[in-house]
């Protein structure tokens, strides 16, 4: 599923929104994302509606087959007063790399408004390539937020064989996690179980990488 452009929106007047996508691709193709939101597209239930997004990256052997991928200024999954739940599983095969479960970058954001909680769950791709992150937030003040509710982030690094650098949760340069009301932040990460180096549970690093609770 691809949503692109400022006028591209999935909205409701108060009901829940459920979006499920599975990436395709074959051979050495890459960038086969399950749910792909870019160029200021939005998923936005109104009222007390909840947003439930699930994505599975495609299984081709090219790079970057994310389960759920948001990128670009104004690209959002948000709510008015409901919960936002995003679950992604990275794809890829063979030596494919950078198959994140959930990837938020380049000023995109995921976050519940009002009293809603934000829950992100990601599983990195099971390949022999590197950098299969469970949850990856990076670049241009990309954000995971909650206005008054809690933020829950759970990531499992992927990889197999000699694969490495498979972080469970990677909050990198200008990646921000911000509970800006009364909510709490819970982050749980497990590094990949492959035999390569640097399979870290939770990584926070790079200029501007931030985890902030105003409570």
How should each PLM-predicted stretch be described?
Residues 1-215:
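Surface-exposed loop/turn motifs in large extracellular/passenger domains
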């Amino acid at each position: 599923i691809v949503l692109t452009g400022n006028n591209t929106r999935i909205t409701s007047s108060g009901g829940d929104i459920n979006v499920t996508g599975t990436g395709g691709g074959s051979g050495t193709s890459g960038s086969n994302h399950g749910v792909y939101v870019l160029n200021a597209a939005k998923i936005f239930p109104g009222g007390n509606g909840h947003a439930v997004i699930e994505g599975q990256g495609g299984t081709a052997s090219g790079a970057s087959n994310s389960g759920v991928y948001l990128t670009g200024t104004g690209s959002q999954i948000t709510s008015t007063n409901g919960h936002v739940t995003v679950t992604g599983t990275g794809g890829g095969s063979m030596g494919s790399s950078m198959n994140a479960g959930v990837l938020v970058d380049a000023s995109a954001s995921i976050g519940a408004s009002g009293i809603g909680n934000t829950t992100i769950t990601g599983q990195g791709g099971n390949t022999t390539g590197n950098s299969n992150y469970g949850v990856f937030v990076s670049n241009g003040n990309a954000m995971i937020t909650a206005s008054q509710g809690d933020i829950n982030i759970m990531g499992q690094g992927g990889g197999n064989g000699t694969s490495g650098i498979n972080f469970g949760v990677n909050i990198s340069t200008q990646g921000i996690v911000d509970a800006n009301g009364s909510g709490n932040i819970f982050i749980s990460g497990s590094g990949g179980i492959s035999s390569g180096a640097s399979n870290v549970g939770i990584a926070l690093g790079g200029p501007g990488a931030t985890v902030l609770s105003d409570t």
